[in-house]
Amino acid sequence: MSKIRRKVTVENTKTISESTSRRPSVFERLGPSTGSTTETQCRNWLKTGSCLYGNTCRFIHGPSPRGKGYSSNYRRSPERPTGDLRERMKNKRQDVDSESQKRNTEEPSSPVRKESSRGRHRDKEDIKIVKERTPESEEENVEWETNRDDSDNGDINYDYVHELSLEMKRQKIQRELMKLEQENMDKREEIIIQKEVSPEVVRSKLSPSPSLRKSSKSPKRKSSPKASSAGKKERKAAVVASPLLDQQRNSKGNQSKKKGPRTPSPPPPILEDIILGKKYKEKYKVKDRIEEKPRDGKDRGRDFEKQREKRDKPRSSSPGQHHSPLSSRHHSSSSQSGSSIQRHSPSPRRKRTPSPSYQRTLTPSLRRSASPYPTHCLSSPQRKQSPPRHRSPMREKGRHDHERTSQSHDRRHERREETRGKRDREKDTREERESEHDHRDDREPRDSRDRRDTRDRRELRDSRDMRDSREMRDYSRDAKESRDPRDSRSARDVHDYRDREARDAHARDVRDARDARDARDARDIRDVRDVRDVRDVRDVRDVRDVRDVRDVRDARDVRDVRDARDVRDVRDVRDGHRKEDVYQEEARSYGRNHLREESSRVELRNDSRNESRSEIRNDRMGRSRGRGPELPEKGSRGTRGSQMDSHSSGSNYHDSWETRSSYPERDRYPERDTRDPARDSSFERRHGERDRRDNRERDQRPSSPIRHQGRSEELERDERREERRIDRVDERRDDRVRDRDRDREREREREREREREREKERERELERERAREREREREKERERERERERDQRDRDHDREREREREREREKEREREREERERERERERERERERERERERERERERERERAREREKERERQREWEDKDKGRDDRREKREDIHVREDRIPRDSHEERKSKKRYRNEGSPSPRQSPKRRREHSPDSDTYHSGDDKNEKHRLLSQVVRPQESRSLSPSHLTEDRQGRWKEEDRKSERKESSRRYEEQELKEKLSCGDRQREQAESVDSSRVRAQDLLSHRQAEDRDRDGSDRAHDEKKKAKAPKKPVKKKKEEDVGVERGNLETHEDSQVFSPKKGQKKKNIEKKRKRSKGDSDVSDEEAAPQNKKKRGPRTPPLAIKEELADISTDKDGVLEDPLKKENTAFSDWSDEDVPDRTEGLEAEHTAATATPGSTPSPLSSLLPPPPPVAAASTAATALASSAVSATTSATSSSSAATSNTNGSEDSHRKCHRARGEKVEVSHVTLEDTPHRKLVDQKRSSSLGSNRSHRSHTSGRLRSPSNDSAHRSGDDQGSRKRVLHSGSRDREKTKSLEITGERKSRIDQLKRGEPSRSTSSDRQDSRSHSSRRSSPESDRQVHSRSGSFDSRDRLQERDRYEHDRERERDRRDPRQREWDREAEKEWPRTRDRDRLRERDRDRDRRRDLDRERERLISDPMERDRERERTFETSQLESGKRSEVKLESEHERDLEGSSRDSVALDKERMDRDLGSVQGFEDVSKAERTESLEGDDESKLDDAHSLGSGAGEGYEPISDDELDEILAGDAEKREDQQEEEKMPDPLDVIDVDWSGLMPKHPKEPREPGAALLKFTPGAVLLRVGISKKLAGSELFTKVKETCQQLVEKPKDADSLFEHELGALNMAALLRKEERASLLSDLGPCCKALCFRRDSAIRKQLVKNEKGTVKQAYTNTPMVDNELLRLSLRLFKKKATCHAPGQEKTEDGKLGPCSIQQELCVS
């Protein structure tokens, strides 16, 4: 409490309270000597904005000073005009000590009652708020005492804790003062009498203060010292406690309501309070009950106060305000009811413990125990002295209040009597009298209470005046203590004020009614009484603290000893403050005795304080106890109590403690307990009395009826208001007396404070010593701990190192094992490669036959396409695309690229741009014939290839991939669907051709059919990969797809351009979209009617539509996912049909079925046959599949990669999963259905159709999948599945996750390469030729190519996948492989992009197993080999897409190198072997088709050639349409691809689990040696010629002969003969070089502006300017061309400056320096120039 606040006497308070310019502080509002309250904002004002007291209100009605200055500001803010709260409180203490001795004699019961009721409230609140004030928290008081030392020293906690404690004390005092005012109004006459009784009052106040403190500390004291009044107090506790409890609960509720945040009472006291609250809650509940018995003893005083307050409530509402103003004070002060109570009680507790100043005051406060501060002070000393005493402020009220109250109170009364003699005896007498009197007063008419209140107020004023004078004397002490008690108080007031501002807004709204009514009366009463009470309470408390000190000194009670210790600690902590607090405590005890009518009032106040503390404890704990009247505070304190409990740290103090005194007291408590516990206790008591009065007043208005006198509080409030008004006048009179008394009391208080502070200093020293000892112990312990940890760490490190070494050894062993495995794998792979070579030879023969059939099929397809073109006006563009396709697949590929770029650029939605582009672009018409090329086959292959070429070409793939691939995905999906329809038509046409092919393949095709029946995947694999018998034509469409895939990896651009221009024209052509969809629907209807059920066709359409709908990016992702997943999913479909089956089961049933359905639909569609399929396919699938595809594309792009990869059959999240599962299921069903459904002819036909679809759709899909990367669209999936499913189903069956990935890349590669081979051969590919022709015409006819695509891709992929699944089911070996590989494939599908090489290795290992299975069945083997190579091709394509994304050249080189590897067989890396095997498989498939077995060598060569062609088409086809591939080329390509694929299949069959390490990733890299890089420019600088050139040639050094040679050479090389002459102008080579450089620099000025020369940077601009300004000769201008080593100008200036300095220093040196400087600068200039 800074002296400024202390300066405020009761008169100042009156003046201040009368002046509306400032808001009356808590002290002003609370009591006469509320100079401190001057800056305490009126809670009524804060709450309601209006105060009934008006100018007389002791509290500030302006902006809350506390809100402003919560901490140190608040110290002064509460009593701004008067001075620090501490000073005011000291003055008040002194005044109250003198006055309260007088008054307490005269009006001990009313002020004491107010104090004690406040003290009870505070104690209750302290106890309640400091719910956890357990012995631990009491022990915390020691820490708080230490903190008190800090607080005395103005520690960090000072502002918060000290001000909290100050605020809490102030508010308690204010409540008490309000009670006292109310009582003083009754008791002003009695106050005078009590002033006579002042020694007794001091003693009784001291005793009641100890009772309050001790009672608050221990209900025992309350009981025992007030045993006489114990019955009264118990009655009163019963009476008052129930109202108090009600008020406490009300105040708790109100405070909880009003102050969500309590004013942060010192958190450390909260710990004590929490500890107390924990132990004390139970104890306190018991003790509160007991206390309420002692409180009934105390509450007799308190209940006298309360009854008087009840009586006075009409008059002064002071008794209620004892409780209610306690609550109100706590509310208003702390949280304006509970907050101040809490601040007072819990905060004091906490602050007593935490705030040394508080503990200085704590002893007084504890004795006052109305103020939690003393409780804390005592608590920490009590902890030292007797933990119960610490508790007793809060807990001891619960615990020891009975014991201590009786014992300590009696002993304190005795000691105070001994100490103070008359006053103590009078105070004991008064306390007893006042407890009786309070009971009486409660029973007494308000007049007697008013007299007592008046006396209390007068005594309070006098004691406060004395205290104020003391406080002014204590100013210096208060300078210390001002931080602690005053600052605690001011912090309390600030906190209370802030909380009050928060609460005051609420609490004043609530209490403004009360405060307006009661506060003015109660403030008059309170201000008189509260100032007296605060001062008297403070003085009484200080006197009590002194007496407690004396009682402690008497050591009758260990608690008294502890109190003394606390007092001593408080005094030690606050030696100066202790004296002040002693004075203040004496004044307070005196004033309290006066205020409490010594015994009764002090007992009542101590009881009320102790009970308030216990109530505060209870309130703080839970406010469940002893405070009926403090229900608002209980609410606030309930919040505060809980928040205090939570606020052990004090975080919620402010929140919970809305009353400033509670929060600041709490905040101050830690510091007061730490610093000025005694003074803080005194302050707490003073403030607590005021705060209690305030809270009682306010609470008594709303709360006191609620709490204790809630029934009569309304009347009593009004009466109290009137009485307060009277009492204010009386208080003003009393203030003068009180000022004198206060001066006396302050002197006594200061003496006591000095004593207390000495005690506290001693205690603190002991504490510090103990703390140092503990710290040393802790340090030693920490050192030991650190040592242990270091040892442990070292041991752990050693163990870790051992483990690391072990792991390294394990890794070495693993690596060796893996090396051995890899060697074995390579051996197995080589055998498989040989096996595949043989297979490829067979395949090539079959491929040649198939190629011939494909030629026929292509012819039919072209006819179909012509029909389709004729049918579709949109397809006229597509017909142009067909022409262009026929002419140049590369052009269509370019078109596809451009259109895919289109899409990327223009069409985020796959449908619109793909449709439009399909419609408008050759791609759309001819399925990716960007130039509207009429050759839809070429366009399809081109479109497909551009996908791969884009995949191959990183820029195209990356840039255009999403857009173009999306477009192409849509286009290829639509084109695929249209191709599927076309393929269906073609397959209808080709069904004969396919059947013929398959009959031609019948050797293999019989196997294939048997295997197709077993598993259509095998049939498709045979058709497509395994035997490529039906596939051979398809594989010239489809195996070309696979070689196309491979070559698309290699020649992705070209072959994809060619084959996938067909396929992708179908698949991607956006323009075809609608007509494609319709035509595909019609075709699917027709074909679905013929071959596939409408359901199949419809799901196909749905699936196609699904992808069409999905965004391009999604579609492309899905397409790539499809590619990966098609390959993978075809493996899974073979294994699990987990491939992305977006289509319904019937869509998927068989690709063959779907293809046949497509054929039928395509055939019907060309004829515009609206079969049920078209009706079924187009409408439902577009919706389902469109949404599904859109969702699936989006989700399958994400989840299809994951879900489909993880479980292809598991519904790729949303549609993708459903597509996958549908496709799988549909494939399985469809395959089963088609196996059963499709005849052997149909099976071949389906194979052809599937192969066509697979080739067109598969390559489209592969391309799309490739192109789209992971964009998976059902169309792409079905495209992949249709094309890839045949080969990739084999792969799916035969390859695991790696096969999946290979299926993705191989299907892509296989389908695309087979298509590319077909395109290269000139066949559009079976599916490409027939399906593409059909698809082109169909897709052009199909209004929605997406639906066609979906139909094609879905039906194709589903059919082939279902067949594959059927085959898998039939072939348990393949099922096993599928099971092995499918999960892996799914895993690898997820990881395929990342780990496809690994997947390939694993697929190879799996494929080795599969090869064994295939070797069991040569057809199976062939199909597997083909599928594996195709998968590998697809994987290669993926690899190549990855690598092609890096560079198309790489993929070309890779494909070439793969072919070379296959040819060489030496450089068969796992990946290379996979690719080679894929190529060889494709080659063998194609070679099977290509009847010419002699072409095996050709196909190996042709693989290289076709790969070269593919690479060329990739390179050129990326930008150009792919050139049509002749059948011979295709056969060679297919043969080479098949051989390489066989080799790769062998390797893939070998794939026993290979690690990424095992994978020879070099296969991804082009085999051709890197071009020798020219040495870097940096190295060129150091060639001899360059060095000499830089140096320049000097005639002298080089010699005339050499120089002549050089000159001649230079002249020859120089362009302008003129320049040659000037080359060697100078003798020195360096000068020549410099001149030459200048010329070059000048010449390059405006020409060589660097890479980023859109704008001239300043550097370049300035350089140019410098160069242009320069002379050729290198004059000074030239110095700026190159940054001069020396800035000549700067040098000159610096030299001049140096010279000047040197001249100044040594004028003689100037000349030499000038002389030196001149030459230096000149020389340097010359050098620089």
UniProtKB/Swiss-Prot annotation:
Where are the compositionally biased (Basic and acidic residues) regions? 76-136, 182-193, 283-315, 393-528, 581-636, 655-701, 710-897, 920-938, 957-1035, 1047-1065, 1114-1137, 1149-1159, 1228-1253, 1278-1288, 1296-1351, 1359-1440, 1447-1482, 1490-1499
Coiled-coil annotated spans: 162-196, 706-865
| Cellular compartments annotated | Nucleus speckle; Nucleus, Nucleoplasm
Phosphothreonine is carried by which residues?
263, 353, 363, 958, 1109
Bias (Basic residues) occurs at 214-224, 1036-1046, 1072-1086
Zinc among the record's keywords? yes
| Zinc finger (C3H1-type) residue numbers | 36-64
| Highest taxon, organism lineage | Eukaryota
One Gene Ontology MF term: zinc ion binding
Query: Position of cross-link Glycyl lysine isopeptide (Lys-Gly) (interchain with G-Cter in SUMO2)?
Result: 179
Which Pfam families does its entry note? zf-CCCH
Biased amino acid composition, Low complexity: 204-213, 321-345, 1160-1176, 1184-1218
Q: For the region Disordered, give the residue spans.
A: 1-40, 57-156, 182-528, 581-1527
PROSITE patterns from the xrefs? ZF_C3H1
Give UniProt keywords alphabetically.
Answer: Coiled coil, Developmental protein, Isopeptide bond, Metal-binding, mRNA processing, mRNA splicing, Nucleus, Phosphoprotein, Repeat, Ubl conjugation, Zinc, Zinc-finger
In the record, which positions carry Phosphoserine? 64, 77, 198, 207, 209, 211, 242, 265, 316, 318, 324, 327, 369, 371, 380, 704, 907, 909, 913, 921, 924, 929, 949, 951, 953, 1069, 1086, 1090, 1093, 1256, 1259, 1273, 1275, 1295, 1427, 1443, 1447, 1467, 1470, 1499, 1526
Compositionally biased tracts (Polar residues): 10-23, 245-254, 358-368, 639-654
Entry's PANTHER family?
A: CHASCON, ISOFORM D-RELATED (PTHR13585), ZINC FINGER CCCH DOMAIN-CONTAINING PROTEIN 13 (PTHR13585:SF19)
Its function, per the record, reads:
Associated component of the WMM complex, a complex that mediates N6-methyladenosine (m6A) methylation of RNAs, a modification that plays a role in the efficiency of mRNA splicing and RNA processing. Acts as a key regulator of m6A methylation by promoting m6A methylation of mRNAs at the 3'-UTR. Controls embryonic stem cells (ESCs) pluripotency via its role in m6A methylation. In the WMM complex, anchors component of the MACOM subcomplex in the nucleus. Also required for bridging WTAP to the RNA-binding component RBM15 (RBM15 or RBM15B).
Q: How is this protein named in the record?
A: Zinc finger CCCH domain-containing protein 13
